[in-house]
A protein has these predicted regions:
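Short beta-strand micro-motifs within the conserved protein kinase catalytic domain, predominantly
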Residues: 76-86
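A conserved short helix/loop substructure at the end of the activation segment
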Residues: 257-268
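ATP-binding glycine-rich loop module of kinase domains
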Residues: 24-67
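Conserved short submotifs of the Hanks-type protein kinase catalytic core
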Residues: 84-97
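Catalytic-loop of the protein kinase fold
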Residues: 130-147
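Conserved catalytic-loop aspartate of Hanks-type protein kinases
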Residues: 201
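Activation segment/activation loop of eukaryotic-type protein kinase catalytic domains
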Residues: 147-178
Length: 274
């Protein structure tokens, strides 16, 4: 997708625009106009190839996220349909993501420890979502934007917690396996679907903190392993023997507990980082 559709140009009247992400089924644009700076998301179906099956849900994801953001009371949210799928427009959040903020911690020979305040700000953003009765379903470092005043939790297309109109909804089939809780992986392997939960979000946050601070995934499997093999490693509990330094060490280990009931709640995570 090299150009924005007419419906977006009419809605935003951009004076500047930049495509920042172009992947199968989705493009994201940074757009600036007289009314401010916005993120524009376009979804369209993924066509089948010899390497992957066709996917229709990517066409619905932007509108589903837009509907959820609207229900959560977010401001300046617009979404709708275009000829190949759906779109949404939402405020642009300035700042690097969690993985980039902790890049110096992962440098060879670095003695810089991950800042607990950054971890707390990520936990607080997830706590705000859980407090409204929603689970995110796709917790990963790239979805925590560390802004100058607060951390923003973005990409809510897979969130669950309330009704979504039938024409915009689709089943949850897991997320990026690096951050997928064992119970989610097990359900996806068994049935092809799963149900996001706050407990699974806690696991995802723990895995996101671990890889951002150390460079290591929580679970050990080959880098080029198929997703089914990755998920089976998660189900088998092949936890990598890596921990975070300082106060984050025991906390992240608890967040990565195999049993969901053994993980702290998000409020307990925030309290532990005060």
């Amino acid at each position: 997708m090299s150009e924005l559709p007419i419906v977006i140009l009419d809605a935003v009247a951009p004076t500047k625009q930049r495509c920042i992400l172009n992947r199968r089924g989705s493009t994201v644009w940074e757009v600036e106009g007289d009314r401010g700076k916005f993120a524009v998301k376009l979804g369209y179906p993924i066509e089948a190839t010899s390497e992957w099956a066709a996917q229709e849900w990517t066409a619905l994801a932007p509108a589903r996220e837009g509907a959820i953001l609207y229900r959560l009371g977010a401001s300046y949210i617009t979404y709708g349909d275009w000829e190949r799928g759906t779109w949404n427009i939402q405020p642009w959040h300035e700042g690097p993501d969690l993985y980039h903020v902790w890049a110096t911690c992962r440098s060879e020979g670095s003695e810089i420890e991950p800042h607990e305040g950054v971890a707390r700000s990520c936990a607080e953003s997830l706590a705000a979502l859980h407090a409204q009765g929603w689970a995110h379903g796709d917790v990963q470092p790239a979805h925590f934007i560390i802004g100058p005043e607060k951390t923003h939790l973005i990409d809510l297309a897979l969130a669950h917690g309330g009704a979504v109109s039938e024409g915009r909804d689709f089943p949850y089939r897991g997320c990026l396996v690096h951050y997928e809780a064992p119970e989610i992986s097990a359900s996806v392997l068994a049935t092809g679907e799963a149900e996001p939960s706050p407990e699974a979000d806690i696991y995802g946050l723990g895995a996101a903190l671990l890889i951002s601070g150390t460079g290591w995934r929580a679970v050990e499997y080959p880098d080029d392993a198929p997703r089914a093999v990755q998920r089976q490693a998660v189900v088998d509990g092949k936890r990598r023997e890596v921990s975070m330094p300082g106060k984050l060490g025991h906390l992240v280990d608890d967040m990565l507990s195999y049993n969901p009931a053994d993980r702290p709640t998000i409020d307990e995570v925030v309290a532990a980082l005060l």
